[in-house]
């Protein structure tokens, strides 16, 4: 897991090239203007999913992880809390090849981050994440880019 902000150019310069490609794409395109849904950048190897939703409470959300792709969550507007843990600390359910989706169950939270505009979170296959959690007392309407980078 890597947590940071897209505007910290010096710090981000040491990140893997595939992650830096996400930031370059975001800086060259106004992602706030993108319609919700999948946008192909480089075939199945590199694409972005633009999502928008209202944050909520933990009881209404679920744990997930992925095997084929790295997730790079980039907050465009609003704020969202994301709970994190390692997949070995949760009960792994049946992996769904289509959609690259590993559902997990459990109550354990190892750590949490709050994403605000410009913040990013990189999730690797071992990083279970529970998204769409409200960051404070009030729900927030968010728009976020989730880059999918294939693991080669």
Which role fits each region the language model picked out?
Residues 72, 120-122, 139-152:
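A short hydrophobic beta-strand segment most commonly corresponding to one strand
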Residues 68, 105-110, 132:
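Short alpha-helix capping/helix-loop boundary micro-motifs
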Residues 114-134:
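Conserved metal-binding segment of the jelly-roll/cupin
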Residues 79-82, 128:
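Short beta-strand segments in beta-sandwich/barrel cores
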Residues 1-47, 65:
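A short, N-terminal "cap"/entry segment at the start of jelly-roll beta-barrel domains
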Residues 68-70, 74-80, 88-89, 97-102:
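Glycine- and acidic-residue-biased ligand/ion/polar-headgroup-sensing regions
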Residues 72, 111-113:
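Short, surface-exposed secondary-structure edge patches
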Residues 38-57, 68-77, 84:
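A short glycine-rich, His/Asp/Glu-containing loop-to-beta-strand
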């Amino acid at each position: 897991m890597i947590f940071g902000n897209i505007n910290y150019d010096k710090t981000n310069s040491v990140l893997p090239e595939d992650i830096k490609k996400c930031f370059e794409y975001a800086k060259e395109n106004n992602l706030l203007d993108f319609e919700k849904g999948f946008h192909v950048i480089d075939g199945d190897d590199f694409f972005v999913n633009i999502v928008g939703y209202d944050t909520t409470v933990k009881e209404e959300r679920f744990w997930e992880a992925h095997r084929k792709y790295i997730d790079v969550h980039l907050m465009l507007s609003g704020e969202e809390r994301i709970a994190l843990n390692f997949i070995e600390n949760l009960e792994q359910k049946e992996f769904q090849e289509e959609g690259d989706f590993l559902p997990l169950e459990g109550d354990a939270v190892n750590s949490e981050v709050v994403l605000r505009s410009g913040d990013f979170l990189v999730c690797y296959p071992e990083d279970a994440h529970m998204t769409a959690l409200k960051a404070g007392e009030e729900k927030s309407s968010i728009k976020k880019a989730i880059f999918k980078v294939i693991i080669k």
